[in-house]
């Protein structure tokens, strides 16, 4: 009996998702927090050969407190500098990236960072390639919470999406 294509495609997608969730289900969730700031699953995308820039994200960056806070700086030994960036669509429908002076967090609010949209941390002047499976430290400076140290995991976008979905539920 032949299974119709309309049924086979969702089954195939569901199987891939289930396998990714199984593989990541045994991976320890990682994150950090100080005071009211909570960071879950810091990750970076693997860099292309010869690339001098990379990007890092958080599945969630949350402020559980009653006062606003702001991420104002970041640093890592794998890059000469880290810039805070945002991606947005301009009036002509063109995606634009720009550096920002900080990432504001309202009280009781959180943001989700993902490749291709919203905020990210641009790693400028990479000192080594970002290879899948590698980890590196990053120091984050907040106006109120102060300094938070995180361990960033280098992962492909499929693994990142699965982990972000796990943290979102």
Positions of predicted regions on the chain:
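Compact, glycine-rich, soluble single-domain proteins
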Residues: 32-169
